[in-house]
Swiss-Prot record:
CDD domains: Ribosomal_L16_L10e. GO terms for biological process: translation. GO terms for cellular component: cytosolic large ribosomal subunit. SUPFAM superfamilies: Ribosomal protein L16p/L10e. This is Large ribosomal subunit protein uL16. Belongs to the universal ribosomal protein uL16 family. Part of the 50S ribosomal subunit. Binds 23S rRNA and is also seen to make contacts with the A and possibly P site tRNAs. Keywords: Ribonucleoprotein, Ribosomal protein, RNA-binding, rRNA-binding, tRNA-binding. GO terms for molecular function: rRNA binding; structural constituent of ribosome; tRNA binding. It holds the Pfam family Ribosomal_L16. NCBIfam families: rplP_bact (TIGR01164).
Amino acid sequence: MLQPKRTKFRKMHKGRNTGLAHRGSTVAFGQFGLKSVGRGRMTARQIEAARRTITRKVKRGGKIWIRVFPDKPITNKPLEVRMGKGKGPVEYWVCEIKPGKMLYEIEGVSEELAREAFTLAAAKLPFKTTIVKRTIM
């Protein structure tokens, strides 16, 4: 599963997920991309589940790029523990997703196969997505 090797601080504030994604919003590496339309959090497990789905669908053909990385730690206090006494231990890692963020890219496969793979992967994600094609300039 994806997670940072080391961080400056162990725990993070919750924060608010507002605005649109301006960086990482275009197809930069492949021919087709899976782009977020909604906002939310994508856990390391969800990133891996969607990646495995895409890989299984395209089999040996094509190259896949993962354009997101879970760099935010989410903490959780154990069950039946009273409030207070500090923040709980880190349970898992997430990536904050804003509308317009490119999640996955693929090349070397037909458009039909790319659409099928991305549709299956999108079912594993907690927000709406769309499939985009690279625009030649």
